[in-house]
C-alpha cells in the first residue's frame, strides 16, 4: 500500500487538518520507488518519512517488482526526504518527531543484496537517518513458486545480516526480531 497516487489529496487534507488544530507529526509510509517531484511537493507537509529500500540490484528490482532503476530512483527520493526533514529527532518518550527511517526487508537467498544496502546506508546516510532491518518476509502469491523466495528467511541468513550491521558499526538502526511473523496479521489482498 503506497500513498503516492494520493499525494496531492494528502497535501490538501493536511492543510485542512492543520487549520483545524492538528498538531502531531505527519508520517509518510512509502515503498521508496517515488517520483522525486512528488516528494518535493510534499516539502513542509511531512515530518517523518518511512521509505522502503528493497533492492540494491537493478536485476532483482526488475525481476521481483518490475521496477527499473529502482535503486537510483529510491535513493534519490530518500536523499530528498532527508533534505526536507533533516536528522531524526525524538521526544522524551523516544517517539520520532521528525526525520527519516529507511526500512529494508531481508529476502531469503539474497543476503548480498542486504549487505549492499547496509554498506550504502553506512557510506551515504549514517548520521542523517535511521535504518530498520526487517525480518518479516514470507512468500505470498507468485513468490511461493519462486525457488529463491518460496520461504521465510532463516536464522543463519538473519544472523549474517546482524553481524554485518555490527561490522559496519551502524549506530542509528534497528533490527526486527527473527520470530514468528504470523500470516494471519497480513491482509488477504
Regions found by a protein language model. Give the residues of each.
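Conserved AdoMet/S-adenosylmethionine-binding subsite of the radical SAM
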Residues: 1-147
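Conserved N-terminal glycine/acidic-rich loop preference
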Residues: 91-94, 100, 142-172
Amino acid at each position: 500500500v503506497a500513498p503516492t497516487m494520493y499525494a496531492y489529496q494528502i497535501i490538501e487534507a493536511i492543510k485542512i487538518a492543520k487549520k483545524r488544530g492538528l498538531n502531531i507529526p505527519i508520517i509518510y509510509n512509502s515503498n521508496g520507488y517515488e517520483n522525486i517531484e512528488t516528494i518535493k511537493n510534499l516539502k513542509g507537509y511531512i515530518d517523518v518519512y518511512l521509505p522502503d529500500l528493497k533492492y540494491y540490484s537493478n536485476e532483482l528490482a526488475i525481476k521481483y517488482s518490475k521496477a527499473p532503476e529502482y535503486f537510483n530512483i529510491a535513493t534519490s527520493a530518500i536523499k530528498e526526504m532527508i533534505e526536507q526533514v533533516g536528522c531524526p529527532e525524538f521526544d522524551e518518550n523516544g517517539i520520532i518527531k521528525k526525520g527519516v527511517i529507511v526500512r529494508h526487508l531481508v529476502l531469503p537467498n539474497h543476503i548480498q543484496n542486504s549487505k549492499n544496502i547496509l554498506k550504502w546506508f553506512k557510506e551515504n546516510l549514517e548520521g542523517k537517518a535511521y535504518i530498520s532491518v526487517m525480518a518479516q518476509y514470507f512468500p505470498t502469491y507468485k513468490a511461493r513458486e519462486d525457488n529463491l523466495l518460496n520461504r521465510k528467511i532463516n536464522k543463519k541468513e538473519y544472523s549474517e545480516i546482524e553481524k554485518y550491521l555490527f561490522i559496519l558499526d551502524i549506530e542509528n538502526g534497528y533490527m526486527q526480531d527473527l520470530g514468528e511473523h504470523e500470516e494471519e496479521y497480513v491482509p488477504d489482498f
